[in-house]
């Protein structure tokens, strides 16, 4: 993170290209992993295009699904909450953005954040990246 932000601030890395690289990687691994369940790469690229400063300048970051991100759902993996769209960012997301971070989407979580295994009826199971047979 530190190296990415320093390179963006110095003009050596393009934050839009960084987001594009993350989007490519997501496309390759998402079917097996199912970790980033609400991607927002187009919006993230547009935001990255105007970021050049801050301690997290241009650093792509996912946000756990329990935190509000304007325009995305916060379901906690509970079917009755599906479809409800956040009207504003949670305080932690506001701080992330203020520091120059680029929100690429929301990451899956256990239903109601109750268990240790990430699986819920809204977004499904997230698998271990090195052993997709495990959750």
Question: Could you describe each region identified by the protein language model?
Answer:
Residues 57-135:
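Short glycine/serine-rich loop/turn segments
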Residues 49-55:
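Short amphipathic alpha-helices and their capping/turn segments at secondary-structure boundaries
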Residues 26, 44, 112-115:
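Short secondary-structure boundary/hinge segments and terminal tails
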Residues 15, 44, 89:
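Aromatic/hydrophobic pocket-lining residues that form the small-molecule binding cavity
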Residues 1-41:
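An N-terminal boundary/leader segment
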Residues 42-49, 100-101, 110:
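Long amphipathic alpha-helix in the N-terminal Rossmann-like dinucleotide-binding domain
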